[in-house]
Amino acid sequence: MGRTLENKKSIVAELQETLSQSQLTLVIDYKGLTVAEITDLRKRLRPTGTLCKVTKNAFMRIAVDGNQTWQPLQSFCQETSAFLLVKDDLGGAIKAYQDFQKATKKTELRGGVMEGRSLNADQVKAIGDLPSKDQLMAQIAGAINGVATKLAVGINQVPTSLARGIKAVSEKEAA
């Protein structure tokens, strides 16, 4: 027995809702993956705020139809498609997928869509090479901490230098 019209509409509505919360969508060919491997991919992606959706291409085409941001996604909807819907950590999600791809050697990245632009595999890899959100926050925190440390040392040196100067003058006068 096939899906009911209401069921199909709810699937499309769920896809539209998930897309509205996503910054980047990657399309991969998942042919040859076992259920255990797809589950492993989902586990790797979960900490980065990414969902792995395996759905019919027709549902995804309907979900993005008329939406300028995700319209280019239609060109990737062919054969066996899994959609990686990235909400937060773009670089982390791409790195997690690349690690999975190296481990299984079964999937192929078709491309992605970000801010209404279609991305090829090289462009997606370039985004993945950018530092992750956590790395950027650590770099900023380190820079702020470094400035505060230098300021504290500088403020501490002024009275110390002044005290040394006064002591030297008093010793000179006493002699």
Curated annotation (Swiss-Prot):
The gene is rplJ. This is Large ribosomal subunit protein uL10. It comes from the Bacteria. GO terms for molecular function: large ribosomal subunit rRNA binding; structural constituent of ribosome. CDD domains: Ribosomal_L10 (cd05797). Part of the ribosomal stalk of the 50S ribosomal subunit. The N-terminus interacts with L11 and the large rRNA to form the base of the stalk. The C-terminus forms an elongated spine to which L12 dimers bind in a sequential fashion forming a multimeric L10(L12)X complex. Belongs to the universal ribosomal protein uL10 family. It holds the Pfam family Ribosomal_L10. PANTHER family: 39S RIBOSOMAL PROTEIN L10, MITOCHONDRIAL. One of its GO terms (biological process) is translation.
